[in-house]
Amino acid sequence: MIPHIQLKLPFILPQINEPKFHLFPEQLTIPFKPTIKEILKQYLKNPDSGDYVKMFQKVLDCGTGKLGYHIKVCDNCGETKIIPNACSSSLCPDCQKENAKRWIENRISELLPVPYYQTVFSLPDSLSVFTMYNKRIVFDIFFFAVAAAMNKKPGEKNIEIGFIIALQTWASSLWFDPHMHVCMPGIGILKNGKLNQYPSKESLPFNEDILSKEFKKVFLEKLEAHYFKKNVDGNEIINWPDEMKSIGEDEASFKKWISELEQQKWDVDLGKPTYKDPKHLISYIGKRLPISDDQIIGVKSGRVLFEDTKEKQVSLTIEDFVKRLAKHAMPSRYHKIHNYGFLSNGKKTESINRICEELGNPLPVIESEIPSGCTICKKGKMLSVGLILDGGAIKICEKNIERLRNKPAWLDQLKEAQNLNDLLLPLRLFLLSKMNEYQ
């Protein structure tokens, strides 16, 4: 019998997977071509960076083990992997690059053999500060109003169109400028099942003026209804900026503000059809971050030089760069992309297959959203059976363990443990070796 040996690690799990770059000394200039994470690391050393530590520290800890690990086991062969947890931050270059790549690949696999249209909906500049303080409220209303505007005229003709709405919050130079891109294939489905194609911009059931009026009308109606809503929960409370508190406190002032917004122009830009290659459109709206590592030119004398969305060079102090980047943080677990109409999640596969059959085109291969197959047996699916949290605490997923067809014997011991130090030495070393594979 193997004795139970208490393993006293200077146990900080993250040490196993510390990133392979050195911290920069205070007086050392950042390398000419730094990453966004390296710029953040440099800034967070600043004693005045306190407001941003919580937001960006988890980005720096992403994939290092400091956020813990998850244990995955193949439900067919029992292959085991222990993978550092990702941060899932809306501002993490690693997480969002991977999310965007997977989303773009899947959407390209679903493209229909018809022209595609891009429509951009923008909020008035006068709503920018209010939006900054109320992202979840405004973005929810924004999605609802854009979808209502897109559906109104086709709905009147008993036609169901399909479209994707993608929220982007940035303009050039990292300024906060929330707007929505709508990607729509030029085809609709009538209630009798027949297809209705839109080969040109003129053939569409709406134009920019129709879309703008409906967008403005629905948005302001929803915003006003939210203002007068009773018994709202924490996420629904309107946060008024200091310069707008009088509007929030006085009903007459609020109605006057709504009236002023009604008089303003609400921009809608309806583009020409994309005949040749809608892949570029999908790639563009699939972007998740306001800036990528590729846009960073360098850092010198405390300033970041980067290329903006218009391919112009911009120079900002590191502090201003981080502050502008922080403005694009999304509410927790907020989804920036939504599908509507015949492209909604419950209808998409059937609709795409049906349209392709009608048009005589091969059916696209629709990939799984998250690749989770076993790389060893090529047959099983990797299931998360547990978490190893900071400090070695263990949390088990009983449901997935029961789904395993080939269950490793060590799982029974793992189920009884509260912490890695509760495990017998052989199993502890086995798990630590699996963690070390991602060093």
Regions found by a protein language model. Give the residues of each.
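Beta->alpha loop/short-helix hinge microenvironment recognizer with preference
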Residues: 1-439
